[in-house]
Amino acid sequence: MSAPESPHEFLRRDEYLGPLVEEHGELTVEPANDFFERFVVSIIRQQVSMASATATRERLFEAVEVAPEGILAADDEVLQDAGLSRQKTTYVNNIAETFVEKGYSREYFVEMSDDAIRDALTEISGVGPWTADMQLIFSLGRPDVFPVGDLGIRKGMVQLFDDLDRRDRTAMVERSQRWAPYRSYASLYLWRATEA
């Protein structure tokens, strides 16, 4: 099956997402300028409010060079003073070590499938399926990722489909197939739907 000309034209025709596309305009999925920085920001955002994540991000970016070498050169105390928990400090160090050891970059993953990338990233201690999916969408700009592990996605699905149980992830993934090959774009609209 060939991909439709535009994700927005495709989703605009969907009876459920079409109104959200009209309301919010053309939301885009693009690769991040810096894969490693975006990865670190995803770790910062795990299980905290956006305000807390933003404050920690600002302090961390002021305290150290947010690159694999910069993170590895920094004392854990410096990372924790910037607002990272001990656990997140360990995770960020694990990611930095893996990037250095394996040569990870956006280019490294270009030819790999989403599943292969997800498998590679979740081998890093501290990186689960949610974080891997966020990297696929926001770091690598992959167009067809459906992060069903995200609470906002599940809330958005229940909002759109009143017959769905918020705990039934399998049914949500099946229902999301209607938006393939643009489920990353659909996810952006699902998140927007829950912000209202």
Which sequence ranges carry the predicted segments?
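Catalytic cores of DNA base-excision repair glycosylases
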Residues: 27, 61-196
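A short secondary-structure junction motif
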Residues: 41-56, 81-87, 186
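Generic recognition of short, well-ordered alpha-helical interface segments
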Residues: 12, 39, 51-55, 87-94, ...
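Short helix-loop boundary/capping segments at the starts of domains
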Residues: 26, 45, 49-53, 62-66
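An N-terminal domain-start capping segment
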Residues: 1, 38-42, 94, 98-101
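Alpha-helical structural motif
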Residues: 2-6, 13-16, 56, 153, ...
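Intrinsically disordered, low-complexity, charged terminal extensions of DNA damage-control enzymes
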Residues: 1-31
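Short, contiguous, helix-prone interaction/anchoring segments in small proteins
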Residues: 34-35
